[in-house]
Amino acid sequence: MQQLILASSSPRRQELLRQVGIPFVVAVPEVDEHAVHADSPAELVERLALRKARAVSVRYPGAIVLGADTIVVVDGEVLGKPADRAEAEWMLGRLSGRSHQVLTGVALVRGDEELVAHEETVVRFAPLSREQIQWYVETGEPMDKAGAYGIQGRAAALIASISGDYYNVVGLPLHRTVQMLTQFGYPIFTGGAG
């Protein structure tokens, strides 16, 4: 079977691939995410995912490299990972009682072959009190996540609704990723369920 390399240090992306039984090796890309610019959030996540996959692909010729990048967008403003607790509180205040978009870019690279797409999910937070925001920030959970929350963790108690791919919000849209891997000739649905 062809080797799949995950160009990400995200434990959530690793867990999602394990969940569906896709074997992979992790290789952390060295990419300056702040140096990437785009005209739209969708274009931004696709460019970032592709840049990550390309950065790792040069070290693994012949392998399929999977890169991904997730952002949160509210009122057209991109919210990345908070720099500190104050910024996490500010971000959660922005999301309180409102809908926002979560976009994940997914890129596959094998040599000169490239495939890029993105997924968008709409998430609505319940109205949050200052105490709820402080409680959540004090857990430490928001600090390494785009938009300062992890839907798969304690923030689940703060979410009013979701429209779209739940796994996209976690960090990797599994259905789209599997479709892309299949399109790339990676055999996912063959053999036994061993």
Swiss-Prot record:
<dbReference type="GO" id="GO:0005737">
    <property type="term" value="C:cytoplasm"/>
</dbReference>
<feature type="site" description="Important for substrate specificity">
    <location>
        <position position="70"/>
    </location>
</feature>
<protein>
    <recommendedName>
        <fullName>dTTP/UTP pyrophosphatase</fullName>
        <ecNumber>3.6.1.9</ecNumber>
    </recommendedName>
</protein>
<dbReference type="GO" id="GO:0009117">
    <property type="term" value="P:nucleotide metabolic process"/>
</dbReference>
<dbReference type="GO" id="GO:0036218">
    <property type="term" value="F:dTTP diphosphatase activity"/>
</dbReference>
<keyword id="KW-0963">Cytoplasm</keyword>
<feature type="site" description="Important for substrate specificity">
    <location>
        <position position="152"/>
    </location>
</feature>
<dbReference type="Pfam" id="PF02545">
    <property type="entry name" value="Maf"/>
</dbReference>
<feature type="site" description="Important for substrate specificity">
    <location>
        <position position="12"/>
    </location>
</feature>
<dbReference type="InterPro" id="IPR003697">
    <property type="entry name" value="Maf-like"/>
</dbReference>
<comment type="similarity">
    <text>Belongs to the Maf family. YhdE subfamily.</text>
</comment>
<keyword id="KW-0378">Hydrolase</keyword>
<dbReference type="GO" id="GO:0036221">
    <property type="term" value="F:UTP diphosphatase activity"/>
</dbReference>
<feature type="active site" description="Proton acceptor">
    <location>
        <position position="69"/>
    </location>
</feature>
<keyword id="KW-0546">Nucleotide metabolism</keyword>
<comment type="function">
    <text>Nucleoside triphosphate pyrophosphatase that hydrolyzes dTTP and UTP. May have a dual role in cell division arrest and in preventing the incorporation of modified nucleotides into cellular nucleic acids.</text>
</comment>
<dbReference type="InterPro" id="IPR029001">
    <property type="entry name" value="ITPase-like_fam"/>
</dbReference>
